Design a protein with these regions (language model features):
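Alpha-helical subdomain
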Residues: 1-170
Length: 170
């Protein structure tokens, strides 16, 4: 079935990037954007970092029941599109943000605004995320985006050439 292997590889790749960042910034904030019930932050815990899991309030409420926050971990209810959550992140030791399967639900302009806002608020921070090209987004739309009632995939975030498409966002 389409997607199972891709999801497993995505999680592996994102965890690799988070761990690589923590090697040079062991006390960094590890921020899971749109966390759902994902435990990548905990899986990458080096014993010194601070872990933040962000998602909508109803998701965080369920997460609190099933995956209570650990000692250096916070579950933060928020809308990622509202920058008020920036103030809740202690990035004094650096910050690595990751979004796993999240930006497919955002319009391109919303992703751009979020990325630019984060760049201003967290200088030197790193953002790791997955993205698909327009063809893959159309395939995804036939499966799980339909469940989310997303119809106009043409407006949603997709990347075919990261360097040429994302570099102008600086």
């Amino acid at each position: 079935r389409f997607g199972a292997l891709e999801v497993a590889m995505r999680q592996n790749d994102l965890a690799f990037e988070v761990r690589a960042y923590l090697k040079n910034h062991p006390c960094a904030a590890v921020v899971n954007l749109g966390c759902g019930l994902d435990n990548t932050g905990s899986a990458c815990d080096n014993g010194r970092c601070k872990i933040y899991n962000l998602d909508f309030p109803d998701v965080i409420a369920l997460r609190q029941q099933l995956l209570p926050a650990g000692e250096r971990e916070q579950n933060i209810p928020c809308d990622l599109k509202d920058p008020a959550w920036f103030d809740k992140i202690d990035a004094s030791g650096g910050a690595v943000f990751f979004a796993s399967g999240v930006f497919y639900y955002f319009l391109t302009q919303q992703v751009k605004a979020l990325v630019q806002g984060m760049a201003d608020a967290f200088p030197g921070g790193v953002l790791v995320f997955d993205a698909a090209n327009r063809t893959a987004v159309k395939m995804i739309a036939k499966t799980w985006l339909r469940t989310a009632k997303i119809k106009d995939v043409g407006a949603y975030f997709a990347v075919s050439d990261a360097k040429s498409e994302l570099s102008p966002w600086d």
